[in-house]
Structure formats: structure tokens, C-alpha cells
Design a protein with these regions (language model features):
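N-terminal active-site wall of soluble small-molecule enzyme domains
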Residues: 47-93, 104-105
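Glycine-rich, proline-tolerant flexible connector loops at the mouths of alpha/beta enzymes
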Residues: 31-54
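Catalytic beta/alpha-barrel core
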Residues: 36-38, 44, 68-71, 91-103, ...
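C-terminal functional modules
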Residues: 251-352
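Catalytic alpha/beta core domains of metabolic enzymes, predominantly
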Residues: 121-255
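Short, acidic/polar
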Residues: 13-27, 76-86, 129-130, 205-212
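Catalytic domains of carbohydrate-active enzymes, especially glycoside hydrolases
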Residues: 17-39, 87-94
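Active-site mouth loops of central-metabolism enzymes
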Residues: 2-19, 67-79, 192-204
Length: 352
């Protein structure tokens, strides 16, 4: 089972606010905590003390803190990749390498005596992970995570995301991607238009982003990149992540009948394996409600994303629930009862 995560940035907030956010995330089952230690511009001891205070509190809740770091900071802190005791003393669950070494160092780091996880960047599209694997790392301690992208239009395209993710899936490594809170206001840098991995996610509701990542089958863990997400977002994300089946938002037509509402919302839908190019068919509603009335109404022509129920004019198909995949003419035997919400239409391509 994958894990949900949040991000906190102690240098840009207060311990009291971070603590309250950790409590809220813990309430909804969040396990991972991402934080960034890419540069230290102020007093080193003060910054590290603030980080440790947050890490200690997260650990007290049973959460796992991943510290984002780059090779330059190893030099600034006078620590070495072959001695991770600094991060062990900090209480970190793992270290994420924002910029990697040569491959040999990463492999050696996975064999540290503290069991600290080493998380590497998944988004570069190079043979980086293949190189690390050639040095026989301890794969129990080797994880992958995508970047997030504060600059609008700089996030990953879907094809590149798949290409990169499959490199890690090939080795059965744990994978993580970031989603974007619409209510959060900051990240590790002053300028940010949200902090998501996929550019197409930037303006979507958080639950929709999560549904998409799950449906790709490529991502284990999902973290919110920016802070602080609202309680409603934390709740909706957890519900989407933990759902036994994917759900789609439906905007119903005015005037749908109670029987049609029952067909739509009181049933678990699955589509037939002999999939049509024109419709997704959930056939069991016609069996369950064969004795119910489905009179003709709203029999306009059908468009991609429309939700349909066959009316009594379709004989034995009466009560069958469908989703239109293409535009189609309506001969009066199909009721258009709703429509997949525009922002989730793209999810139809990912249903399996």
C-alpha cells in the first residue's frame, strides 16, 4: 500500500504552524513528510535546530521525514556521502538527492548502517537509475521521486512522465510524485505557481490529480508539494487515494428521475470486457432494475463524456448505464442523464 505525504518548509514558516499542519495530516493518515534543505543562507546552527524540531515532532507522530539535499550542501555541512550519521542524528527517514552523484556514491549510500532511505530524482529522463543499479545498491533503501515545478508550464508532460516512471518500475523501486494544493501559498522558493509534477495537474482539484496518478499505475506514494493544504483538500486527497475503486465526478441533468439517480449513484459500476469504441457499458443496472420505469426524456444527441441510461424504447437494454466515448446520434431510445465533469473527462482514457 502506498503512502500519502505533505511538505513543510521550516525556513519559511513557524514551528507552531508546521506542528498544526502535521497534526492535521496525521489525522487523515498521511505518513510521508518532505522538506527541503538545499541551501543554508542564515546561521547554520539555527537552521538545523529548526529543522530538527520539526523532524522530531513528525517522528513522534509516526511520520517519515525525507530531507531534500544536494551535493553542494554536503560540502557546506562538512559531511560525506559515506557517513550519513548527520541525518541519523537529525532523525530523518531518508535523504532525497536533488542532484545526484555518479551512481557509485548513491549505491554505497543505500548500504548505510542506519537504514536511511536514499531517494533519487525520477524526472531527468537519463540512464541515472540504470547506472546506480549497475553498482548493486540495496534496493530496500533506494526510492524514486519525481520533481515538482514551481514555474507554470515547466511541469512534466505526460509522455515524459511515463518514460521516466517506467525506468523505475522496471527495477520494482518505490515511486512518488507531487500534486498541487490550490489553497497552499508557499514552497521552498519565493516564486511558485503551485508545486506539481505534471503540468496538466496545476489547476486541477487535488482529488482529480490523485485519481489520475493512481490510474497510471506508475506511482506508489503521492505528496502535496506546497504548503499548507486545507483540511478539506487533505480529506479529499485521502479519500481518493484510499478508494477501492476510481470515482468520476458527474454533473447531472435537470429532471433526471429517481430511478436514474439510483442507477448512477447507488451502484458500483464496471464496464464490459468487450469494450466498444463508442460507449462504456455498465450492464448490471439493467438487471437490477428491469422492473423499474425508465420513460424517454432528454433524448438529445450524445457527446463525448455524456452519461446515458437506455430508456424503455430499448427493450431488454432498459436501465443500462453508459458513458459516451464519441459523439453519437440519438434515435430517442437513450436518456442523457448527466455528464462527466469537464476537468475529469481525461480520466476516461485511463479506466481499465
Amino acid at each position: 500500500m502506498g503512502k500519502l505525504g505533505i511538505s513543510i518548509y521550516p525556513e519559511r514558516s513557524t514551528f507552531e504552524k508546521d506542528k498544526a499542519y502535521l497534526d492535521l495530516a496525521h489525522k487523515y493518515g498521511y505518513k510521508r513528510v518532505f522538506t527541503s534543505l538545499l541551501q543554508i543562507n542564515d546561521d547554520k546552527e539555527k537552521v538545523l535546530s529548526e529543522f530538527k524540531e520539526v523532524v522530531d515532532y513528525a517522528n513522534s507522530l509516526g511520520m517519515e521525514v525525507m530531507v531534500d539535499i544536494n551535493p553542494a550542501l554536503f560540502e557546506q555541512l562538512e559531511i560525506s556521502y559515506d557517513d550519513l550519521s548527520f541525518f541519523h542524528k537529525m532523525g530523518a527517514y531518508g535523504v532525497r538527492l536533488d542532484i545526484g552523484f555518479t551512481g557509485a556514491e548513491e549505491a554505497k549510500m543505500t548500504r548505510n548502517p542506519f537504514g536511511i532511505k536514499i531517494e533519487i530524482n525520477m524526472s531527468s529522463g537519463t540512464n541515472y537509475v540504470d547506472n546506480i543499479m549497475s553498482y548493486s545498491p540495496n534496493t530496500d533503501n533506494l526510492l524514486g521521486s519525481h520533481n515538482f515545478y514551481p514555474h507554470r508550464y515547466s511541469g512534466l508532460g505526460y509522455e515524459h512522465f511515463v518514460f521516466c516512471s517506467e525506468k523505475f518500475r522496471k527495477y520494482n523501486l518505490n515511486t512518488m510524485a507531487f500534486v498541487n494544493s490550490q489553497s497552499a501559498e508557499f514552497g521552498p522558493w519565493p516564486t511558485q505557481d503551485g508545486l506539481c509534477t505534471l503540468e496538466d495537474h496545476r489547476d486541477l482539484e487535488i482529488a482529480t490529480q490523485v485519481k489520475h496518478l493512481i490510474l497510471t499505475g506508475l506511482i506508489d506514494d503521492i505528496s502535496i508539494g506546497n504548503a499548507y493544504a486545507s483540511e478539506e483538500e487533505l480529506k479529499e486527497m485521502a479519500e481518493a487515494f484510499n478508494a477501492d475503486y476510481p470515482t468520476l465526478k458527474v454533473d447531472t441533468e435537470e429532471g433526471i428521475t429517481e430511478n436514474e439517480r439510483i442507477c448512477l449513484f447507488d451502484n458500483l459500476h464496471s464496464y464490459r470486457g468487450d469494450r466498444s469504441e463508442y460507449i462504456l457499458r455498465s450492464t448490471m443496472t439493467r438487471v437490477y432494475y428491469k422492473d423499474k420505469d425508465f420513460p424517454p426524456h432528454n433524448t438529445r444527441d450524445m457527446h463525448h463524456g455524456d452519461v446515458l441510461i437506455d430508456n424503455e424504447g430499448y427493450g431488454q437494454y432498459k436501465g443500462e448505464t453508459q458513458i459516451a466515448l464519441k459523439d453519437m446520434k440519438n434515435d430517442g431510445r437513450v436518456n442523457v442523464v448527466g455528464r462527466i465533469s469537464d476537468d475529469e473527462l481525461f480520466l476516461l482514457d485511463f479506466l481499465k
